[in-house]
A protein has these predicted regions:
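Extended, aromatic/histidine-rich regions of cofactor-dependent oxidoreductases associated
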Residues: 1-16, 20-27, 37, 82-196
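A glycine-rich, hydrophobic loop/mini-helix early in the fold
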Residues: 8-9, 14-62
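Short alpha-helical interface elements
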Residues: 57, 71, 77, 159, ...
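Mid-length scaffold segments of soluble, non-membrane domains
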Residues: 64-87
């Protein structure tokens, strides 16, 4: 987790849905549980997994422990997006963490993106996003926002350090130290989304 784990009572939970700044809808936990659900087994991996095995990297020096596989259950995000269009889907958690994915990933029902409320057949543990989180199979862990509070459709990537910061960019091999980063425009560098 990037920030402290929020304490959210299930009866107080709300997921707000916006297009740009226009409010579209609000879902309670009970609303979500009444919708048709789907189960997906996927592996989530932190973008920094095994970072400690590289030379001179910043950030937590992870070994191989920032990865796990689980069965998730929730609402296919594509079902919530049926009548909409955009370039990006922004996610914001109750903990303040913000990230985005391309709209085509979330809108594709074969992409298995979920608004999930169960993990391995039981309600989500608090550390894994209770009561609701986003699951984006095949994407770096930071795109799988926990404690999801808002889904916003936009035409630009979200402007957050977890999306546009150097930790989540595919930097060219010529970048050997932090001072070298000032020589490039980070907006021209691809954001890490998919993992092998």
């Amino acid at each position: 987790n990037h920030n402290p784990v929020p304490i959210i009572k299930p009866e107080d939970y709300e997921l707000n849905f916006f297009i740009n700044t226009k409010f579209i809808n609000k879902f309670t936990l009970e609303d979500l549980k009444k919708m048709k659900s789907k189960k997906v087994i996927t592996t989530i991996q932190c973008g920094g997994n095994r970072r400690g095995e590289f030379d001179k990297t910043s950030g937590t020096q992870w070994g191989i422990g920032a990865i796990s596989t689980a069965e998730w259950e929730g609402i296919p995000l594509c079902n919530l997006l049926e009548n909409y269009n955009a370039k990006y889907i922004h996610f914001e958690g109750y903990d303040g963490v913000k990230s985005s994915i391309p709209f085509k990933k979330g809108r594709n029902c074969f992409g298995d993106v979920l608004v999930a409320y169960k993990m391995n057949g039981v309600e989500l543990p608090r550390d894994h996003g209770y009561p609701v989180r986003v699951i984006v199979p095949g994407y770096v862990g930071i795109r799988n926002i926990k404690w999801i509070q808002e889904i916003i459709l936009e035409d630009e990537e979200i402007d957050s350090s977890w999306q546009k910061g150097i930790a989540y960019k595919i930097l060219p091999g010529s970048i050997r130290c932090l001072e070298d980063v000032s020589k490039i425009n980070l907006d021209d560098i691809d954001t890490i989304n998919e993992l092998p």
